[in-house]
């Protein structure tokens, strides 16, 4: 109605932060563009190569000018990534030196974006959620971080002789064309990358299927199957890239929409070990030891991916 009183948001003074608020990750270039919550934080705009701010996951209609509207401020400085994260009261500061980054995972599940930085020190990873519509800006940030953590790298490893450049015929990947498309994007942006291996998604069965409990488990898995999701591995002389789903394991018949990319500097890999999966037959778990941090990749036991990981070239070998 025309005579209805204005909403609370419109009765409050407008602010530049509120005017610009939306689901997008923005680049920050001036002190005025820094969200007010973080303005006293340890971020040097002049010395940072890229600074971005990540908005809260709320609808525009639910925002007000008096709210702190940004969840994170990320600054790629000369030696470290600094992440300021909003809390109920104030914010926390996390500093991740580039030399201690073990792996970077980024990707989306529809519009649910997630960036995770794994440290080689064994501490908890740093995770930032964002709207998937801003994946391009997040990719720019990841590219800056990777350039810094590869600076001075002397890995220069010789890839396996059967590593292949260019196009690959992905058989049985009809349900995972999104991963194939992501692999194509990697090749276009990084021509030096070579294909190592891939495995398609497959339904798996429990390893121990004896007795009454085994029969019950088989019945449950028949009605509600467990699927090990597909993945593609590629590399250049300094980095391993794994293209995968956010969840390696999916139960039932639910559709899978996520696409993630994990990059690992080869220089950080101390060793790779493979062990049989505790529950599922025909699956091995490759553990990449990166300092005090371990990343696990489940792959089919007889797949090219398992073979590639068994003979992975390591700088410390």
What are these regions (language model features)?
Residues 79, 85-89:
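N-terminal beta-strand/beta-hairpin edge segment
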Residues 89, 93-98, 116-118:
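"Short basic amphipathic alpha-helical interaction patches in structured regions
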Residues 1-68, 74, 78, 109-110, ...:
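Intrinsic disorder/low-complexity detector
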Residues 82, 100-102, 268:
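Residues located in well-ordered beta-strands
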Residues 96-100, 106, 110:
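Elongated alpha-helical scaffolds
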């Amino acid at each position: 109605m025309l005579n209805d009183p204005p909403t609370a948001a419109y009765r409050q003074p407008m602010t530049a932060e509120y005017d610009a608020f939306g689901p997008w990750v923005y680049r920050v270039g001036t002190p005025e563009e820094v969200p007010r919550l973080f303005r006293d934080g340890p971020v040097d705009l002049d010395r940072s190569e890229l600074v971005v701010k990540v908005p809260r996951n709320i609808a525009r209609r639910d925002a007000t000018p008096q709210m702190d509207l940004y969840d994170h401020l990320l600054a790629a400085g000369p030696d470290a990534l600094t992440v300021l994260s909003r809390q109920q009261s104030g914010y926390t500061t996390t500093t991740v030196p580039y030399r201690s980054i073990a792996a970077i995972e980024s990707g989306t599940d529809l519009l649910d974006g997630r960036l995770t930085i794994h440290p080689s020190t064994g501490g908890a990873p740093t995770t930032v959620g964002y709207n998937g519509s801003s994946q391009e800006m997040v990719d720019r940030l990841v590219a800056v971080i990777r350039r810094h953590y590869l600076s001075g790298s002397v890995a220069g490893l010789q890839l396996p002789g059967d590593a292949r450049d260019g196009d690959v015929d992905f058989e049985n990947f009809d349900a995972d064309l999104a991963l194939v498309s992501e692999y194509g994007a990697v090749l276009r942006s990084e021509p030096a990358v070579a294909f190592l291996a891939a495995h398609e998604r497959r339904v798996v069965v429990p390893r121990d299927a004896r007795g009454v409990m085994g029969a019950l488990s088989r019945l449950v898995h028949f009605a509600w199957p467990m699927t090990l999701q597909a993945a593609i591995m590629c590399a250049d002389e300094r980095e391993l890239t794994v293209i995968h789903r956010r969840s390696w394991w999916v139960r039932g018949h639910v559709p899978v929409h996520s696409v993630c990319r994990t990059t690992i500097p080869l220089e950080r890999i101390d060793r790779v070990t493979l062990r049989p999966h505790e529950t599922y037959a025909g699956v091995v778990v490759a553990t990449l030891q990166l300092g005090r941090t371990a990343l696990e990749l489940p792959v089919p036991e007889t797949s090219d991916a398992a073979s590639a990981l068994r003979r992975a070239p390591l700088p410390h070998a």
